[in-house]
């Protein structure tokens, strides 16, 4: 099973598209954990309506504690072998979960995937790597570590690429890796970027 954690805060405009992309996954063995982080728009009503139609959706309500706390709350409820994060103003392709699982084996800890930045009149594909699949080991893993920790020269020149590796979304994580090591998101107010430290 894949646990999909969706932190929600005042994204009613985009939330239906996000949830539709999740409930319509071709890989059906998923749970969708939506953490409403104190939304003041009609996001809670949208979440309630979707949860009433699909038993795979769990809605958790909390006061507005921030993105990190919402993701951590979702992790507490995750029951899947795998976990992924989808922001509530994003959506994923209908074969996303199926495709990701097809690239995993018993030794996989995390599977990263590319994404598209959507704007009103343009789309910008963001490719993480040039190859379709890469396994990092030996000396090549040091390059990956450096990329996860800080932006490289190209990213500093093109800031739109900075989040390509450091985000929580765009990845399928082995749940046991997160839970056994007690990994959690540190609130952004403490470190400035919650995704980077988690990764």
Where in this protein do the model-derived segments appear?
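Cell-envelope/extracellular polymer assembly enzymes that use nucleotide-activated donors
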Residues: 1-3, 21, 31, 197
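Short hydrophobic beta-strand elements that form part
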Residues: 3-6, 33-34, 61
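Short, well-formed alpha-helical segments that are part of the catalytic scaffolds
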Residues: 10-24, 46
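Acidic helix N-cap motif at the loop->helix transition within catalytic regions
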Residues: 16, 41-49, 61, 91, ...
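A conserved acidic beta->alpha catalytic loop
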Residues: 21, 28, 36-45, 63-65
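Glycine-rich, basic loop-to-helix element that forms the pyrophosphate-binding segment
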Residues: 62-78
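Donor-binding/catalytic cores of nucleotide-activated saccharide
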Residues: 67, 88-199
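Short aromatic/hydrophobic "clamp" motif used to bind/position activated sugar donors
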Residues: 83
């Amino acid at each position: 099973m894949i646990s999909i954690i969706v932190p929600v805060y005042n994204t009613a405009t985009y939330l239906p598209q996000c949830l539709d992309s999740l409930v319509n996954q071709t890989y059906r063995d998923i749970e969708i954990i939506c953490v409403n982080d104190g939304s003041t728009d009609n996001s809670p009503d949208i979440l309630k309506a979707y949860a009433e139609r699909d038993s795979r959706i769990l809605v958790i309500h909390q006061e507005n504690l921030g993105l990190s706390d919402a993701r951590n709350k979702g992790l507490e409820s995750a029951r899947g072998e795998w976990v992924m994060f989808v922001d509530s103003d994003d959506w994923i392709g209908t074969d996303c979960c199926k495709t990701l699982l097809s690239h995993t084996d018993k030794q996989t800890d995390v599977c990263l995937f590319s994404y598209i930045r959507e704007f009103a009149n343009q789309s910008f594909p963001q490719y993480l790597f040039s190859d379709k699949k890469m396994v990092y080991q030996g000396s090549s893993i040091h390059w990956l570590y450096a990329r996860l920790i800080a932006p490289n020269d190209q990213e500093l020149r093109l800031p739109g690429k900075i989040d390509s590796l450091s985000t929580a979304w765009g990845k399928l994580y082995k749940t046991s890796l997160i839970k056994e090591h007690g990994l959690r998101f540190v609130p952004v107010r403490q470190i400035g970027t919650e995704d980077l430290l988690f990764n």
